[in-house]
């Protein structure tokens, strides 16, 4: 749990975010985007970050005229404000074609 200035404890929950990066980017740019979002979580106070680069996969249907996407899964412990700011960054990034965040129970978290 995080401590605030008032010595109140902020409860951290487990979250899983999966986002799709455009498939036409080169590998260096893709890794730069992944590291950028990982550092955003770290700087925002996320704990126990587990990042899984799932690679390029064929999509079942076209999303923003893309038939392939690069899947990235991130499991982390954080608060609601962190998730809101993280999703806002994903929403306005032109290189991200889709994202989804789920809140997880302690029982469902992936052990790393």
Curated annotation (Swiss-Prot):
Protein name (Swiss-Prot/TrEMBL): Small ribosomal subunit protein bS6c
InterPro entries: Ribosomal_bS6, Ribosomal_bS6_CS, Ribosomal_bS6_sf, Ribosomal_S6_plastid/chlpt, Transl_elong_EF1B/ribsomal_bS6
Xref: HAMAP family: Ribosomal_bS6 (MF_00360)
UniProt keyword list: Chloroplast, Plastid, Ribonucleoprotein, Ribosomal protein, RNA-binding, rRNA-binding
Family (UniProt): Belongs to the bacterial ribosomal protein bS6 family.
Regions that span the bilayer: none
Pfam families (alphabetical): Ribosomal_S6
Organism phylogeny: Eukaryota, Rhodophyta, Bangiophyceae, Bangiales, Bangiaceae
Gene: rps6
Gene Ontology terms for molecular function: small ribosomal subunit rRNA binding; structural constituent of ribosome
Locations listed in the record: Plastid, Chloroplast
GO biological process, one term: translation
PANTHER family according to UniProt: MITOCHONDRIAL 28S RIBOSOMAL PROTEIN S6, SMALL RIBOSOMAL SUBUNIT PROTEIN BS6M
Chain's role: Binds together with bS18 to 16S ribosomal RNA.
Signal peptide: none
Cellular component aspect of the GO annotation: chloroplast; ribonucleoprotein complex; ribosome
């Amino acid at each position: 749990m995080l401590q605030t200035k008032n010595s109140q404890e902020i409860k951290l929950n487990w979250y899983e975010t999966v986002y799709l990066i455009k498939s036409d980017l080169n590998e260096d740019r893709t890794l730069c985007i992944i590291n950028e979002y990982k550092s955003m979580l770290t700087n925002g106070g996320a704990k126990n970050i587990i990042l899984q680069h799932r690679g390029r996969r064929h999509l079942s249907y076209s999303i923003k005229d893309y038939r392939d996407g690069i899947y990235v899964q991130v499991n982390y412990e954080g608060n609601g404000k962190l998730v809101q700011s993280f999703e806002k960054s994903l929403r306005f990034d032109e290189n991200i074609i889709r994202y989804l965040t789920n809140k997880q129970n302690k029982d469902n978290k992936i052990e790393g």
